C-alpha cells in the first residue's frame, strides 16, 4: 500500500 492510499483507505474503511 502507498502513502496516498493508506490515508484514503483507512479513512474510508474505518
Swiss-Prot record:
It catalyses: (R)-prunasin + H2O = mandelonitrile + D-glucose. The keyword Protease does not apply. It is an enzyme of class 3 (hydrolase). Keywords: Glycoprotein, Glycosidase, Hydrolase. Glycosylated. Its EC number is 3.2.1.118. GO terms for molecular function: prunasin beta-glucosidase activity. Monomer. This is Prunasin beta-glucosidase 1. It comes from Prunus serotina.
Amino acid at each position: 500500500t502507498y502513502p496516498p492510499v493508506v490515508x484514503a483507505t483507512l479513512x474510508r474503511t474505518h
